[in-house]
Amino acid sequence: MLKMEINGGVATPTASAVAKVTETTTPVNSPSPTSSPPPPPSPQQPPQPPVVLSPCAACKILRRRCADKCVLAPYFPPTDPAKFTIAHRVFGASNIIKFLQELPESQRTDAVNSMVYEAGARMRDPVYGCAGAIYHLQRQVSELQAQLAKTQVELVGMQLQRSSLLELIYNMEQTKLSVQEQGQQKMSFESSFESGDEFISSPDEESNDLGFLEDNNNNNNSSMSWWDPLWT
């Protein structure tokens, strides 16, 4: 129904009533057939797993609230509480935080590992600590260097023995070859000498030749003796 206001005996509709009437009488625009279809609904993204914020091992041991930008959180995870326990016993939490704040982030990991190692060495050897471990390692290095030098000397000696043995074998082979060559030369010389003897007469033939000459001399003497009286 329209609400009417009476002004001087004349009923006039109110503004709210007129607005309602215009809304009901306004035709609804139907989508034109040439309009583009609505975009397909985007696939629903899987729900993100809830992030469980767990305090780091340092804050858990110290029983304090772990802040978002905790200096100790990246280096002492909650899964390894013994790491912070060892360092905390020797250096203390305040000193560890102070050391880390004085260093750039690129060197903090090495610093934490060094503090944990030194704290463990101090707990194992309260007197010398890390220096004792370094001393033992240096002594091992010296012993290994001495063994290496000894092995190198032995290796040089074995190489010299090998070279001398090879030289001895070479000399023996050369001597053997020279002996064989001399034997072959001797055999060839003897064979050539024997072949040359075929052209030399034997002693019997020489004696026969000499006998023939003696016979000739005797005949000549006999003939001369026959002619001797004729000339006397």
From Swiss-Prot:
InterPro entries listed in its UniProt record: LOB (IPR004883)
UniProt tissue specificity: Expressed in young shoots, stems, leaves and flowers.
Leader peptide range in chain numbering: none
Feature: compositional bias, Low complexity: 188-202
Region spans: Disordered: 1-50, 181-218
Pro residues bias locations: 34-50
Domain LOB: 54-155
Family designation: Belongs to the LOB domain-containing protein family.
PANTHER family in alphabetical order: LOB DOMAIN-CONTAINING PROTEIN 11, LOB DOMAIN-CONTAINING PROTEIN 4-RELATED
Descriptive protein name: LOB domain-containing protein 11
Source organism phylogeny: Eukaryota, Viridiplantae, Streptophyta, Embryophyta, Tracheophyta
